[in-house]
């Protein structure tokens, strides 16, 4: 825990020099641990669950919010670009139908082809359904939860 805490304290210090306040956390490589220390370090949420869930965030007793991921933006080699677009749109539609969260995530190193061939069609679909869905960030959603939910 001491290495975890000291590394995060240094990250927060470096981020603050750029006027960035780190509040949400993603565990590297899905190696989840030391969760009990996140709230004490000023974090308000973390992303967990790499089993693709359409669900809801859960608040821990320490007020830290756990956001379950739905799917990673990535290129599946056996799928056509058209099928990728179809699948991602279907995930959004299922979240709307079932009134659940849809938590997309990606690595900055994702293939450029995703940015050019999939994201525009998916974001257009989300925009068309904007009256049924709230496109937001994990930080904005956590702030909303903290203002509108009590444990």
Across the structure, where does each feature detected by a protein language model lie?
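An active-site-proximal "capping" alpha-helix that borders the catalytic cofactor pocket
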Residues: 4-18
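Alpha-helix N-cap and loop-to-helix initiation/capping positions
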Residues: 2-6, 80-83, 114, 118
């Amino acid at each position: 825990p001491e290495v975890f805490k000291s590394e995060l304290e240094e990250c927060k210090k470096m981020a603050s020099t750029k006027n960035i306040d780190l509040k949400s956390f993603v565990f590297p490589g899905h190696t989840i641990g030391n969760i009990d220390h996140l709230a004490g370090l000023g974090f308000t949420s973390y992303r967990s669950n790499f089993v693709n869930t359409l669900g809801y965030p859960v608040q821990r007793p320490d007020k830290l919010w756990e956001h379950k991921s739905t799917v990673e933006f990535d290129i599946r080699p056996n799928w056509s670009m058209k099928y990728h677009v179809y699948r991602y749109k279907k995930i959004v539609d299922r979240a709307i139908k079932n009134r659940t969260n849809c938590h997309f995530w990606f690595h900055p190193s994702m293939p450029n082809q995703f940015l050019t061939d999939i994201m525009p069609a998916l974001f257009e679909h989300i925009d068309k359904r904007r009256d049924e869905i709230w496109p937001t960030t994990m930080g904005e959603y956590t702030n909303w939860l903290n203002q509108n939910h009590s444990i």
